[in-house]
From Swiss-Prot:
It comes from the Eukaryota. It comes from Mus musculus (Mouse). It is found in: Nucleus. This is cAMP-responsive element modulator. The gene is Crem. The lineage of its organism: Eukaryota, Metazoa, Chordata, Craniata, Vertebrata. One of its GO terms (biological process) is rhythmic process.
Length: 357
């Protein structure tokens, strides 16, 4: 046999061997897929499992790398060509998540607990309603002492608004002055003053906040509509100081309100300086300052700062002088020691010079 014949014979043998291996692998893959399909149908609960009537495997291909074609005949009589692809099975990486079961149980409240809560709320309301008011306690304590001003109780909303009051509702705080006047302060900052002869809050007159052209710093201007006979009154006002202005007529005499001490007590008197008619100023030692007082305060602070600076400079100069004196004394000591060392050096030279000769 020639060499060409041997080569052809070997090639045909190799092709047959490769085709047989491909067909065997395709048969294995088909049987595996059929088994998996049947097992899946059995797991899902299907009773009838479709079976393949005929599976014929035919290998076609001329080259070594050409894929093989598988003919699969279905029960309905159809023939399907399936191109075999050999794949190595990979283990599944998907892991089933761990599910934690949480049981939620709702506990219904019993009727006893609900009844106890209702009873507790009723008791709390009764205790709060039985408590005496702060003004009632003060009135009971100050009823025996004539010097302490009496604090009037507030009128309830059921009694209605007094007929003489047209610009505000029932006041929240009512005070009685030493001369018998009633002063009412509402939540919005409105002040009302009644005459001594009026009953309760009847005859209260409104004091409204206004703005003037150039008010002093820290002052507040209000409208004043009442006037006493003697011209001197004292009343207690919680909060900031006020400036009182006559509301009835522009020709009425003006008044000045001055606060003395830490207690907010104001004395109304005639002004000594030329002020606009009907306008008065309220001055307080702690909060209101005139421009002259502000200038004096600034001058005093400046002088105090200069005095502190002078004292600090004097102390600095004194320390510098002490340091210079200390340095001078050290220089003097070093000069004396230097002279002694020079003398000792000369004596040593004199002693050593004859020996060398």
């Amino acid at each position: 046999m020639s060499k060409c014949g041997r080569k052809k014979y070997m090639r045909t043998n190799v092709r047959q061997m490769t085709m047989e291996t491909v067909e065997s692998q395709q048969d294995r893959s088909v049987t595996r897929s059929v088994a998996e399909h049947s097992s899946a149908h059995m797991q899902t609960g299907q009773i009838s499992v479709p079976t393949l009537a005929q599976v014929s495997v035919a290998g076609s291909g001329t080259g070594r790398g050409s894929p093989a074609v598988t003919l699969v005949q279905l029960p309905s009589g159809q023939t399907v060509q399936v191109q075999g692809v050999i794949q190595t099975p990979h283990p599944s990486v998907i892991q089933s998540p761990q599910i934690q079961t949480v049981q939620v149980a709702t506990i219904a409240e019993t009727d006893d607990s609900a009844d106890s809560e209702v009873i507790d709320s009723h008791k709390r309301r009764e205790i709060l309603s039985r408590r005496p008011s702060y003004r009632k306690i003060l009135n009971e304590l100050s009823s025996d002492v004539p010097g302490i001003p009496k604090i009037e109780e507030e009128k309830s909303e059921e009694e209605g608004t007094p007929p003489n009051i047209a610009t505000m509702a029932v006041p929240t705080s009512i005070y009685q002055t030493s001369t018998g006047q009633y002063i009412a302060i509402a939540q919005g900052g409105t002040i009302q003053i009644s005459n001594p002869g009026s009953d309760g809050v009847q005859g209260l007159q409104a004091l409204t906040m206004t703005n003037s052209g150039a008010p002093p710093p820290g002052a507040t201007i209000v409208q004043y509509a009442a006037q006493s006979a003697d011209g001197t009154q004292q009343f207690f006002v919680p909060g900031s100081q006020v400036v009182v202005q006559d509301e009835e007529t522009d020709l009425a005499p003006s008044h000045m309100a001055a606060a003395t001490g830490d207690m907010p007590t104001y004395q109304i008197r005639a002004p000594t300086t030329a002020l606009p008619q009907g306008v008065v100023m309220a001055a307080s030692p702690g909060s209101l300052h005139s421009p002259q007082q502000l200038a004096e305060e600034a001058t005093r602070k400046r002088e105090l700062r200069l005095m502190k600076n002078r004292e600090a400079a004097k102390e600095c100069r004194r320390r510098k002088k002490e340091y210079v004196k200390c340095l001078e004394s050290r220089v003097a000591v070093l000069e004396v020691q230097n002279k002694k060392l020079i003398e000792e050096l000369e004596t040593l030279k004199d002693i050593c010079s004859p020996k060398t000769d």
